[in-house]
C-alpha cells in the first residue's frame, strides 16, 4: 500500500516534470494529470506491491501421463525499465502438469501479475519460466513472449512494424508456441 504522503510527493514530481517539458500547469486539460499519471503508473506496476495470485489446482482423474497444456496469446501490459513506456505483450505458455492442473484463469492472472512491473523482456521471459514452473507445480514449462515496445515504436527508431520475440524453456517440453504480434498497426 502506498502512503498518501508518497503519492503527494510523486504527484509533485510529475508537476515538476511537466513544467520542465514546457507545460502550463494552469491549463484545464492538465489540472489532474499528475494524479492520473501516478495512478496509471501504480496500476502498471502493481506486481511490485501485490502478492502473486493464488493458484487453485484440480486433480487429474486418470492414470495416463498427461500431455502438455498450451495457453496462447495471453495479453498483458508492462513498462520498459529503461524509459517507463508501455510494452504490449502476448505471452504463450505450455506446461507439463504433474499430478494436478491449475485453473486456466489463474495461469492468465499469474502472467498478467508478473508483467505488471518495469521489465527488460529478455530477463522477464526467463523469470516468467521459473515462476510458472514453481507456481504451476509443472514438470516442465515453455514460454514465448512477443512484445511491442513503445520506447522504439514512438521514439528513438520510431518503427511501428517490429516486435520482439523471446523464448525460454525449463525441462524437456518440446511444443511449438504461436505468438501473434500484440498490435496490428498497418
Task: Describe the residue ranges of each PLM region.
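A domain-level signal for the structural core that forms small-molecule/cofactor-binding pockets
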Residues: 1-186
Amino acid at each position: 500500500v502506498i502512503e498518501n504522503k508518497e503519492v503527494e510527493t510523486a504527484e509533485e514530481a510529475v508537476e515538476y516534470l511537466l513544467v520542465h517539458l514546457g507545460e502550463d500547469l494552469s491549463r484545464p486539460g492538465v489540472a489532474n494529470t499528475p494524479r492520473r499519471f501516478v495512478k496509471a503508473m501504480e496500476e502498471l506496476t502493481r506486481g511490485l506491491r501485490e502478492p502473486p495470485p493464488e493458484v487453485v489446482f484440480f486433480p487429474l482423474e486418470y492414470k495416463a501421463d498427461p500431455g502438455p497444456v498450451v495457453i496462447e496469446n495471453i495479453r498483458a501490459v508492462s513498462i520498459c525499465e529503461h524509459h517507463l513506456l508501455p510494452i504490449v505483450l502476448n505471452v504463450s505458455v505450455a506446461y507439463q502438469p504433474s499430478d494436478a492442473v491449475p485453473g486456466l484463469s489463474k495461469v492468465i492472472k499469474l502472467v498478467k501479475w508478473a508483467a505488471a512491473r518495469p521489465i527488460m523482456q529478455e530477463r522477464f521471459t526467463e523469470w516468467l519460466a521459473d515462476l510458472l514452473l514453481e507456481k504451476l507445480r509443472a514438470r516442465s514449462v515453455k514460454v514465448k513472449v512477443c512484445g511491442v515496445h513503445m520506447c522504439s515504436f514512438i521514439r528513438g527508431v520510431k518503427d511501428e512494424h517490429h516486435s520482439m520475440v523471446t523464448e525460454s524453456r525449463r525441462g524437456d517440453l518440446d511444443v511449438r508456441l504461436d505468438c501473434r504480434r500484440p498490435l496490428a498497426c498497418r
